[in-house]
Curated annotation (Swiss-Prot):
Its EC number is 6.1.1.7. The keyword ATP-binding applies. It is an enzyme of class 6 (ligase). One of its GO terms (molecular function) is zinc ion binding. The gene is alaS. This is Alanine--tRNA ligase. Binds 1 zinc ion per subunit. Keywords: Aminoacyl-tRNA synthetase, ATP-binding, Cytoplasm, Ligase, Metal-binding, Nucleotide-binding, Protein biosynthesis, RNA-binding, tRNA-binding, Zinc. NCBIfam families: alaS. InterPro entries: aa-tRNA-synth_II/BPL/LPL, Ala-tRNA-lgiase_IIc, Ala-tRNA-ligase_IIc_anticod-bd, Ala-tRNA-synth_IIc_core, Ala-tRNA-synth_IIc_N, Ala-tRNA_ligase, Ala_tRNA_ligase_euk/bac, DHHA1_dom. It comes from Synechococcus sp. (strain CC9902). The keyword Transit peptide does not apply.
Length: 890
């Protein structure tokens, strides 16, 4: 393969983030890869809080725990990482939310093909000149170096060997592993090939990582070749956008900068005129706004635990940085709206979940503003004690507990003639970092390996949770901070196997229980429970004392959480029964989620459930709840259960003896989950959404019990806000909105007509500027403040005035204050067309000079661009090229 860039014209290369994404997926789809939709940010893997890498959804396939979806796959995966959150906005490349483009081979092609395709994509599809590329290989991977050098043709001086820490991937101390090779972009190739240091972040950026899983590492550390070798790659969308859009950092790409601009507009500042601190705050707001929008969209709600804590922390950082910019009013909803507008084309679910997203943003911002007020009150109390300085511990308490920015504490202290103990604050911050590092969200295959080791030695856990929520038990095995252990202490994150347990382990769509393990001198907060080969693994954190294998403890399930989960689970059964009754008796379940605060049910259906049908389903379910049906739960032979009419999930494997949950006269299903004793315990049921999640699969989301009240309160708040905004009573809002839409439509039509009239009026004066070239009349002029329709009308009018030899090119900015939108129009008479000049082809070429494109008919065409600064030069080029072409014909 030649190491040369494609000869494709620059204008045909991907530029926008959307174009880069689609070009990647199309490239690999054309090469036999199955395009996989992005998985949720909430992974199925219970050991990981969030999806933090493109390969995470395929982790069970790589570990041999799941069948491969296809021999080859490709995806654009949503990811969240928060381990370096302090660097967001301070460096050019750190983000919380990002997209990882990836191509994967599950025992199909391997190293040479992966390398060749990666190079072809980079140089031919993305058009990167090879002189800007450097590759790294593992120090012992002679094969990869040989492929890069001899097959691809990379200059040997630009192939850098790296150590194991940088270029060798492993799933854990044992298991699948292999070398990797990375492609870097060189911003300064003129510095030459000698002494290349890939750690130089100002010169190099790694954008494509190729992992070659080719070995199995045993307990002794020996490597043996795998029978089925795999490929796992990742290309950072934001990084590629920075490279192709030629901007100084990821934040100034079209993937993020519109959000930075929205925040800047809200603050009344100019991003490009700010100092580094101000720019950092805008970058944090832009980055975090994408992240929180996607997290809420995928079902995360703010809390003080797990994913909820990550969401809350990100939201509060947005508010804090807004205050640093002088934004003292609520603005999260505005940023949410801007994020949805930016993300909706690539991620339609954010638009479908817009109401939920904005409600969560509004609610959490209101809470935090109250928290800030309490922090200000505490700071006032500290100042009232007349201290010589504000201690580091006090400043950190304000920061950590109340979300009070250090900068704000310093500012207030300075007004009082005081200083803040920054060294003490940093010491407290470092201690917090170490605690966070121990609990960092990572793609912890090592943790799963440790859990698997422990589970393999254990017998099945005796589950007692159907009968009781509290019971004595004994610690059988323990994993502490990712390693098998015999004991663990306060602050440690642990996975615990008990002899018997009342905790329900995640399964059948229902989340695992929460609760507490307590002993003579220990308390463990249990945050989730999973199952592996009938062994229940309790994950949590030791709050106090020490826990040792063999300890006697009391296991206590959080009763409130269990009640909510079992109400939602029974409601899910009622939902399936109602769907069969209202929509189609043949409806089959495709998946479900039973959480503490919500439920969702996926089912096979060719089309959406209508609004009328959803209303009938709600009425039916609430009727069954009001009828107070007592549930019957019993175990029976699988054949007996099916003969009785029990519903089973298609494709699910069942034992010979199954558990049947029966709501007499309503529903009978095979189910191992927990349920209410009587439907009346559910209280109330409300559908909150219906959507499509895949071809032929629909999803209904709902709330039940106390969650219904919360949902209705949110809706009531939205209605009140709309009423206040439109100065209308609730019953008048729809009428008021329709009237405003009609008014806006009418005004828009009037504006278009006025612009067209203005353009035609201006064109009369322009006609006198036409230049005669033989029998042709050439007119190239700039006309700002006119939209595309008006500019076309003007061009047509001018061409008609100038006759069959007219060659008219007009360009302008529809909004002179917006340099990011350019419109170009060409109108050619029939003599010009006969002279082999076509308006469509010509204007498309000129538009590329403004960073755009377009085309149309031979006699009339329109194009657009994104670079207003280039418009004058583009029009001059049009004038010169047409002059030369027409002179040849004249």
């Amino acid at each position: 393969m030649a190491a040369a860039a494609s000869s494709s014209s620059a204008a045909s290369l991907p530029q926008t983030g959307a174009e880069i994404r689609s070009a990647f997926l199309r490239f690999y789809e054309e090469r036999g890869h199955k395009v996989m939709a992005s998985a949720s940010l909430i992974p199925e893997d219970p050991t990981v809080l969030l999806t933090i890498a493109g390969m995470l959804p395929f982790k069970p396939v790589f570990l041999g725990q799941q069948e491969r979806p296809a021999p080859r796959a490709t995806s654009s995966q949503k990811c969240i990482r928060t381990n370096d959150i302090e660097n967001v906005g301070r460096t050019a490349r750190h983000h919380t939310f990002f997209e990882m483009l990836g191509n994967f081979s599950f025992g199909d092609y391997f190293k040479q093909q992966a390398i060749e395709w990666a190079w072809q994509l980079s140089t031919e599809v993305y058009g990167i000149d090879p002189k800007h590329l450097v590759v790294s290989v593992f120090r012992e991977d002679d094969e990869a170096e040989q492929i890069w050098r001899d097959v691809v043709g990379v200059n040997p001086k630009r192939i850098i060997r790296m150590d194991e820490a940088d270029n060798f991937w492993a799933s854990g101390p044992t298991g699948p592993c292999g070398p990797c090779s990375e492609i870097y972009y060189d911003f300064k190739p003129e510095l030459g090939d000698e002494g290349i240091d890939l750690e130089d972040d100002d010169r190099f950026i790694e954008f494509y990582n190729l992992v070659f899983m080719q070995y199995n590492r045993d307990a002794e550390g020996s490597l043996t070749p795998l029978a089925n070798r795999n490929i796992d790659t990742g290309l950072g969308l934001e990084r590629m956008a920075q490279i192709l859009q030629k901007v100084p950092n990821n934040y100034e790409t079209d993937l993020i900068f519109p959000l930075i601009q929205a925040a800047a507009d809200c603050a009344g500042v100019d991003y490009h005129q700010l100092d580094d601190a101000g720019k950092t705050s805008l970058k944090v707001i832009g980055d975090h706004s994408r992240a929180v929008t996607q997290l809420i969209c995928d079902g995360v709600t703010a809390s003080n635990l797990g994913r909820g804590y990550i969401l809350r922390r990100l939201l509060r950082r947005v508010v804090r940085h807004g205050r640093l910019l002088g934004i003292n009013k609520p603005f999260l909803v505005m940023m949410g709206e801007a994020s949805i507008a930016l993300l909706k084309d690539a991620h339609p679910s954010v638009l479908e979940r817009q109401e939920v997203i904005l409600a969560e943003l509004q609610r959490e911002e209101s809470r935090f503003l109250e928290t800030l007020e309490r922090g200000e009150k505490l700071l006032s109390e500290v100042l009232d004690s007349k201290p010589k300085q504000i201690s580091g511990a006090q400043a950190f308490e304000l920061y950590d507990t109340y979300g009070f920015p250090l900068e704000l504490t310093q500012e207030i202290a300075e007004e009082q003639g005081l200083e803040v103990d920054l060294a003490g604050f940093e010491e407290a911050m470092e201690q917090q970092r170490q605690r966070a590092k121990a609990a960092a969200v990572s793609i912890d295959l090592t943790l799963q390996d440790a859990i698997d080791q422990v589970v393999a030695t254990q017998k099945a856990t005796a589950f007692q949770g159907y009968q009781r929520l509290e019971q004595p038990s004994c610690v059988q095995a323990l994993v502490a901070n990712g390693e098998p252990a015999t004991s663990a202490s306060a602050g440690d994150h642990v996975q615990i196997v008990l002899e018997s347990t009342p905790f329900y382990g995640e399964g059948g769509g229902q989340v695992g229980d929460r609760g507490v393990l307590s002993g003579a001198d220990v308390i463990v907060a249990i945050e989730s429970v999973s199952r592996s080969r009938d062994v229940f693994v309790h994950a949590g954190r030791i709050e106090r004392g020490q826990l040792t294998v063999g300890d006697a403890i009391t296991a206590q399930v959080d009763r409130a959480c269990r009640r909510r989960a079992q109400a939602n689970h029974t409601a899910t059964h009622l939902l399936q029964a109602a769907l069969k009754q209202v929509v189609d008796p043949g409806i089959g379940q495709a998946g479900s989620l039973v959480d503490f605060d919500r439920l969702r049910f996926d089912f096979h259906a060719p089309q959406a459930v209508t609004t009328e049908q959803l209303g009938q389903i709600e009425t039916l379910i609430n009727g069954w709840i009001a009828e107070a049906h007592g549930l019957l739960v019993e175990e029976m032979a699988i054949d007996q259960a099916k003969a009785a009419g029990a519903v089973a999930m298609f494709g699910e494997k069942y034992a010979d003896v199954v558990r049947v949950v029966d709501v007499p006269g309503v529903s009978m299903e095979l189910c191992g989950g927990t349920h209410v004793a009587n439907t009346a315990e559910i209280g109330l049921f409300k559908i909150v959404g219906e959507s499509g999640v895949a071809a032929g699969i629909r999803r209904i989301e709902a709330v039940a019990g106390a969650s219904v009240l919360g949902y209705l309160n949110e809706r009531e708040l939205v209605v009140k806000q709309l009423g206040d905004r439109f100065k209308a009573q609730p019953g008048e809002i729809v009428e008021r909105v329709v009237a405003l839409q009609d008014e806006l439509k009418s005004t828009g039509k009037a504006l278009i007509a006025a612009q067209a009239e203005l353009a035609v009026a201006k064109s009369a004066a322009l006609a006198t500027k036409a230049v005669a070239i033989g029998s042709f009349q050439l007119l190239v002029e700039r006309l700002d403040g006119v939209d595309g329709t008006g500019l076309q009308g003007a061009a047509q009018s001018l061409a008609a005035q100038l006759g069959d030899g007219a060659a008219v090119v007009l360009g302008g900015l529809p909004d002179p204050s917006d340099q990011g939108k350019v419109i170009l129009v060409a109108a050619f008479g029939k003599d010009v067309i006969a002279a082999k000049q076509q308006a469509g082809k010509f204007i498309g070429t000129i538009a590329k000079l403004c960073g755009g494109g377009g085309g149309g008919r031979p006699n009339l065409a329109q194009a657009g661009g994104r670079d207003g600064a280039a418009l004058a030069g583009a029009l001059e080029t049009a004038r010169m090229e047409l002059t030369a072409a027409l002179q040849q014909q004249g």
